[in-house]
């Protein structure tokens, strides 16, 4: 049977200056300089080295494999002086059989390179390309005859559930072997009861009454257990979870899950954290999911690369519909075609069994700085065909750059299309969002359209009673999103909408909002400690969990004698009290606005059913200068 030995402790890191530092994994060398602005974070080759004792194994009957779950971006692995493997691509799992190279004591050297080059994606994008070994490293001890480990980093087991017209479900299980043996397949329900079983490397089992994976309300999962037997003895086992669901997209009616309308409203997510970069823990993944669920989202765009398998597992468990993509982004590389193929193959093979995933993202904003348009289009057609060949059960999509017009041929290659539009932020005029959507839908009524990115920068420390585009205030960000939510309500045919972004994230080329190196469009701050007002706006729109929230709490000092106080809630009635006296009670939806006299300091209490929130404001003679963005002379305000 399999045994896993983690290699996470006691590494030596040889950095850019040649200095050696003791580190544990996960680790990145850009945790600080990749987040402080200047577009000068160090990109190059660093070395990780560790010593380990060979795990206990039978040389005649077992093998030892080395597994990396994420190393950015190009990797050369050397064991005891012998090159084991190389890998280009910073976000996927890869493995190597090291059985014949093992000694009693071993030296493992990993050369990691995130330098600028012309063939490995990403090379240009609005996020930091952290270098390092930032996910788990393990030794896998397996029988010499085992369920395959050497196939694109996947599990060796491919499960395809199909919901039939008679409401039964066919579960096809294909097992790839390295060696010989008898394959036995068991399907268990959530309580551990066996509901189907079969024998063979390619089998189909039928569920008479399948319990569906039904989004956030009921994300039911079966477990498929594949055993490899020899002489009546189980020598290897792989388990994978299975969700039975159907989905489709109607250009005129939106997304459907299991035959019913299921509007997709959610967020995009980058994986990095303040002071840590992409070297994060499972507990941090859990925290991200908890915050996304609190918001009431039902879909996540996992941008702009393959995320940790653990997070896809969480999406399965909590019913999040996922857009998964490769980092074919911003700039087409004429020498990068094979890398797009490799990364797409790894993405699909490694994530095929996740019921949460409904579409494969081919590219993002690829027209920003692409010169060879013919080669770029050919690359897209090739990737689109590859996705359909590898996985005919899912759809393909891409995210178009704002300046990529509706008539651009790249927007008509994939099954679905979405746009990254920031009308009302980078471009004046929130009303343009409605005009743009109406125009596209008029010209292409049979083309499914979504918004893959939309947002505005919002700093919790910046405030204004008269928020304007570009002021980076918490109030303008909220005002922007209020409009966008109403806009989407006017266009219910959209197949999906994804806020950019759930969390602030590092983009070292940026200098905006008074904090260089960051993109502040998140609904939650980079450290996950502060939920901006916009977070509560979406919670009011999407969540069933009763709450009430007074906005602009951090905007304490006011110069006006009467202030407008905004309250977000998903309750129908909100009452506002000032110093214990009821000012007013309103009935409405999502957004409630009150006028409050201000003379000195006032303590407010908002009440919605059993929910209560409080805030304090005070009148001052002069504006608090800390609320206003100090303009800089930086020429690198944006990343492009």
Predicted regions and their residues:
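Secreted/periplasmic carbohydrate-active enzymes, especially glycoside hydrolases
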Residues: 1-306, 312-314, 318-322, 343-346, ...
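Substrate-binding/catalytic cleft of secreted carbohydrate-active enzymes
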Residues: 172-174, 289-292, 299-541, 545-564, ...
């Amino acid at each position: 049977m399999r045994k896993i030995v983690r290699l996470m402790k006691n590494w030596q890191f040889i950095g850019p200056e040649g200095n050696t530092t003791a580190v544990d994994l996960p680790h990145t060398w850009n945790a600080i300089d990749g987040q402080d602005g200047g577009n000068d974070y160090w990109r190059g080759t660093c070395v990780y080295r560790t010593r380990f004792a060979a795990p206990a194994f039978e040389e005649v009957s077992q093998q030892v494999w080395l597994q990396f779950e994420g190393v950015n971006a190009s990797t050369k692995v050397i064991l005891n002086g012998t090159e084991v493997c190389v890998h280009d691509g910073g976000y996927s799992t890869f493995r190597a059989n090291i059985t014949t190279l093992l000694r009693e004591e071993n030296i493992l050297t990993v050369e990691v390179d995130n330098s600028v080059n012309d063939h490995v994606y990403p090379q240009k994008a609005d996020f930091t390309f952290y270098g390092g070994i930032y996910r788990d490293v393990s030794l896998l001890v397996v029988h010499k005859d085992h369920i395959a480990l050497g196939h694109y980093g996947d599990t060796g087991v491919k499960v395809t559930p199909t919901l039939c017209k008679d409401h039964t479900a066919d579960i096809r299980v294909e097992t790839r072997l390295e060696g010989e043996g008898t394959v036995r397949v068991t399907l268990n329900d959530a309580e551990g009861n066996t509901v189907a079983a079969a024998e063979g490397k390619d089998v189909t089992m039928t569920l008479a009454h399948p319990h569906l994976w039904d989004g956030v309300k009921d994300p039911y999962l079966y477990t498929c257990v594949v055993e490899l037997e020899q002489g009546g003895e189980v020598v290897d086992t792989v388990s994978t979870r299975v969700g039975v669901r159907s989905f489709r997209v109607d250009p005129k009616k939106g997304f459907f899950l299991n035959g019913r309308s299921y509007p997709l409203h959610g967020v995009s997510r980058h994986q990095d954290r303040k002071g840590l970069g992409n070297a994060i823990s499972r507990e941090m993944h859990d925290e991200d999911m908890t915050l996304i669920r609190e918001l009431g989202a039902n879909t996540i765009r996992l941008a702009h690369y393959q995320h940790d398998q653990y997070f896809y597992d969480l999406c399965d468990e909590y019913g999040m519909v996922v857009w998964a993509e490769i980092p074919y982004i911003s700039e087409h590389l004429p020498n990068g075609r094979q890398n797009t193929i490799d990364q797409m193959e790894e993405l699909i093979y490694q994530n095929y069994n996740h019921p949460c995933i409904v579409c494969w993202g081919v590219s993002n904003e690829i027209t920003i700085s692409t010169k060879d348009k013919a080669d770029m289009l050919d690359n897209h057609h090739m990737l689109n065909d590859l996705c359909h060949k590898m996985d005919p059960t899912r759809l393909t999509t891409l995210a178009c750059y704002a300046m990529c017009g509706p008539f651009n041929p790249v927007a008509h290659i994939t099954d679905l299309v979405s746009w990254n539009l920031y009308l009302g932020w980078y471009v004046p005029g929130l009303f343009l969002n409605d005009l743009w959507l109406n125009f596209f839908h008029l010209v292409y009524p049979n083309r499914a359209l979504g918004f893959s990115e939309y947002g505005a920068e919002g700093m919790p420390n910046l405030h204004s009673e008269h928020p304007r585009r570009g002021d980076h205030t918490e109030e303008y960000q909220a005002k922007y999103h209020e409009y966008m939510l109403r806009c989407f309500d006017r266009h219910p045919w959209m197949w999906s909408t994804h806020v950019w972004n759930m969390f602030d994230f590092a983009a070292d080329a940026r200098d905006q909002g008074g904090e260089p190196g960051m993109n502040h469009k998140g609904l939650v701050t980079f450290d996950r400690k502060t939920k901006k007002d916009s977070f509560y706006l979406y919670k009011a729109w999407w969540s069933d969990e009763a709450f009430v929230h007074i906005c602009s709490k951090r905007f304490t000092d006011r110069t006006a004698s009467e202030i407008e106080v905004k309250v977000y809630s998903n309750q129908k009635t909100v009452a506002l009290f000032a110093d214990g006296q009821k000012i007013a009670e309103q009935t409405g939806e999502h957004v409630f606005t009150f006028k409050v006299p201000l003379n000195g300091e006032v303590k407010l209490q908002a009440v919605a059913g059993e929910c209560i929130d409080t805030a304090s404001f005070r009148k001052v003679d002069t504006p608090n200068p800390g609320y206003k963005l100090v303009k800089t002379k930086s020429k690198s305000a944006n990343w492009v």
